[in-house]
Amino acid sequence: MWTHPINYDVIVVGAGHAGCEAAFCSAKMGASVLILTSNLDTIAKLSCNPAVGGIGKGHIVREIDALGGIMAEVTDQSGIQFRILNQTKGPAVRAPRAQVDKQMYHIHMKRLLESTPGLHIMQGTVESLLDNENVIQGVTTKEGITYLGKTVILSSGTFMRGLIHIGDLNFPGGRLGDPAATGLSAALKERGFPISRLKTGTPPRLLASSIDFSVAEEQPGDPGVGFVHRDEPFVPPLPQVSCYITHTTQKTKDIIAANISRSALYGGRIEGIGPRYCPSIEDKIVKFADKERHHIFIEPEGIYTQEVYVNGLSTSMPFDVQYNMIRSVHGLENAIITRPAYAIEYDYVHGNVIYPTLESKIVEGLFLCGQINGTTGYEEAAAQGLIAGINAVNKVLKKPAFIPSRQESYIGVMLDDLTTQVLDEPYRMFTGRAEHRLLLRQDNACLRLSHYGRDLGLLSQERYEIFENQKQIIEDEKARLNKTFKKYGNSVVSLAKALCRPEVSYDILRETFPDDVRDLGSTLNASLEMEIKYAGYIDRQKSLIHSLSKSENMVIPEDIDYQSISSLSLEAREKLAKFTPRTIGSASRISGIACADIQVLMVAVKKHAHQ
């Protein structure tokens, strides 16, 4: 075993979406960083759908950009269709989504990492961890190399003891075509990490030239929509394409029903629990038996390939059933499968042994991010990578930890949920997980979080000043519209009051009063409209947050003895000792902790402070 001569500040294990974000931000903050991956040709590979964003997820990508991360930038560079979802619904649930060229996404990310000062990329498979008295020292690889590091970030995705299922066939793999990582799970178990299994899956890929698109509904993109916050209109650098919508048939249902026992999921061969909101097609047929058909979305995988992703047909059926099932779908009667669908089981670590910083409670200096923490999705993984990278560097530099709150970001919501809840399925972000989602809109992420990005050294002063200028423009224009009165309909009202009417949009107001209503650009126009239209709701949510903040942010001492607080219920004592929450707010969100327990805990914390 040879020891590499460099002692890195941060070693990142895995170069998926979590690992790439962790490595980039660590290096950007001035750390010496090594990222290890079993295959340099699969950096930032989009293993499942060729898309970034969506409801809740798109909000997270915007937050990553506001903090100085890179997912938004790489998505904009490689996007081949951009849309805003839920445009007819309220502003809190509107979200950007992009189809991306899978190869271009990998190329742009790899190029960006390679050109980042202080960041070294190395091909190697990590087999074990090095630690001394529960303090991380480095890692060893299958290739016989020891790498020393002050901190280590594990971002192993679905590779830890990954097991692929296609019908009654199963074999080890991190994803189809890539080997599983077997050593890491054993290394974590040896150190007392609680580990369980989760499951996810992916649909077959088809050859576009074999599909009859004439019977499918075309779904084009929206112009001018990107993920990076910018002060000029967004023009995608790649050619833009359409997606298509088709549907299953009665024949599809019959094929699945006749072969349900051959599914790895329903045949009892899978122990891991899959994502509730991304079910397999056999799951949908069984659980929604009364539904005549299910939508299928045909999504291009890139502009230089004929392969398409068939969203909605994830399955663990054997290949012969997949073949017949695909050809029963409207427009896919002659479809050629290029890659089979499969399910995959993998190991994950329980959240009660992880701090909200994503540092483990068992081995100091060891951070975990992405699917190893029980999440599903590229966006959730990237956000965790960003947080893990920031806090790894802060630990090395002996700086305070960075934990965004759930009141100011979806990233904060996720961190709090992962470390206070017992997961019984893969965790996916939705806007409904946030208590104050009207304040956490995708359009105002830069206004909420950019000061953190600047202070951390991830966001340039120039970009920060652009965001601050945008914030000031919105505030100034809001004040001006509140002071400008015009006759509108049968009465004289302020232009802000006129904009509050349901039938009046900012564009309509501009057309009606062109000399009094400024065109700030589509992004700022939309933000200003939301700030004015929903001002009452926004003010109420801000007031609620302010009233709760004193108790929410009350810090619980690390050395508090829950067992000695006799007024706590037995369940509360057990749960608090298990999760060791850092604040009263986090404690209040642990399942099984009653309001009465929180009141008792607050008294105990105050008493502890005076001892």
UniProtKB/Swiss-Prot annotation:
One GO BP:
tRNA methylation
Q: Where does FAD bind?
A: G14, A15, G16, H17, A18, G19
Annotated positions binding NAD(+): 274-288
Location relative to the cell? Cytoplasm
Q: Which GO MF terms are attached to this record?
A: flavin adenine dinucleotide binding
Similarity comment text for this entry: Belongs to the MnmG family.
Give the protein name, as stated in the record.
Answer: tRNA uridine 5-carboxymethylaminomethyl modification enzyme MnmG
